[in-house]
Amino acid sequence: MAIISSNIGDNDFSLRKKELRLVDSKIIPEEKRKNNLNLARPITFQEFIGQEKLKSSLRIAIDASIYRKEPLEHTLLYGQPGLGKTTLAFLIAKEMNTKCRIATAPAIERPRDIVGLLLGLKEGEVLFIDEIHRLNRLTEELLYSAMEDFRLDLTMGANRGARCRTINLPRFTLVGATTKLASISAPLRDRFGISQKIEFYTCDELKQIIDNFSRLISFNVDDEASSHLAKISRGTPRIALRLLRRVRDYAQVVKKTNVISVNLIKKALNSYQIDEKGLDYVDRQYLSFLNQNKNIPTGLDSIAAGLGDDSSMLEFVVEPYLIQIGFLTRTPRGRLLTALGKKYIDSKNDNF
């Protein structure tokens, strides 16, 4: 039960707009993708490429909810950045024929912020909270009764002037997204009826995404080129599309063409210090640092200090792909370069 400032009276739960400016609920309309490349998201599950098992599970849960005329159970989506957690939240709302209101956990600073969001919901709507692992404790505790019983239990005021109030909420679906599942407290995690991991994408799936996007931007990417781009995209659609945009920039400005080949991709990405493995300068610095330690396990904090980078960034941005391609292994004593990783970094004369 959260304590709310006594400055908010019994009839003053429609919090002022300026007090919620950081977390103002935004209703996401059906996307009109005419010429806006930033709205090139899939708008149906059929258009969403990859994650077939996850889509099948969600489809069953959504159809069952529609059949029972109930909101979908609260859903937790977790996985690496750029895999489609936000897009899936929008698709869930669309399939449930409702609206999706969005917020990011760092912007929900005070209990009154989450109160304002919850009171603004209508029956059956989806509330999407990104980076949900970053909710503070008081805000998180307010969500417990909201998720389980669709009510808010508030203590207003303090000491002898304190009073309790329960406010009923419309039935809604909370969709949480996180890159750090272990950072979510057990009480909050257990209140999600559906919990799904979003996996890395296969090269074939990424190739489809690249081909679709290249048609949207009217660029001719040949089959070999899209396959090459897919292989260096770290299994992540966001990276694939970002690289394609950079290659497009190079093709238009330097080569004056709208035809993309493998050779053009290599030249373009070389100018951005990205090599044929999809590794950038930071990745190669990381591998070089481990290589200098002569097969001695090295702690993450030591690596971060040596590179002048944040340990969290290295752990969640750099390391997953290096592990995925077999260049890095984690041991209880620290990080180790694999034989494959050593062979790669030894072959590099890093003059990017």
UniProtKB/Swiss-Prot annotation:
Compartment(s) where it occurs, according to its Swiss-Prot or TrEMBL record: Cytoplasm
Task: Spell out the GO cellular component terms annotated for this protein, sorted alphabetically and separated by semicolons.
Answer: cytoplasm; Holliday junction resolvase complex
Per its record, what are the GO molecular function terms?
A: ATP binding; ATP hydrolysis activity; four-way junction DNA binding; four-way junction helicase activity
Top-level taxon of origin:
Bacteria
Quote the EC number: 3.6.4.-
Segments for region (Head domain (RuvB-H)): 276-352
**Region Small ATPAse domain (RuvB-S): what ranges?**
202-273
Query: Which coarse location class applies to the principal site listed for this UniProt protein?
Result: cytoplasm
Q: How does it assemble?
A: Homohexamer. Forms an RuvA(8)-RuvB(12)-Holliday junction (HJ) complex. HJ DNA is sandwiched between 2 RuvA tetramers; dsDNA enters through RuvA and exits via RuvB. An RuvB hexamer assembles on each DNA strand where it exits the tetramer. Each RuvB hexamer is contacted by two RuvA subunits (via domain III) on 2 adjacent RuvB subunits; this complex drives branch migration. In the full resolvosome a probable DNA-RuvA(4)-RuvB(12)-RuvC(2) complex forms which resolves the HJ.
Q: What is this protein called?
A: Holliday junction branch migration complex subunit RuvB
Give the organism, scientific name: Prochlorococcus marinus (strain MIT 9312)
Gene that produces this protein: ruvB
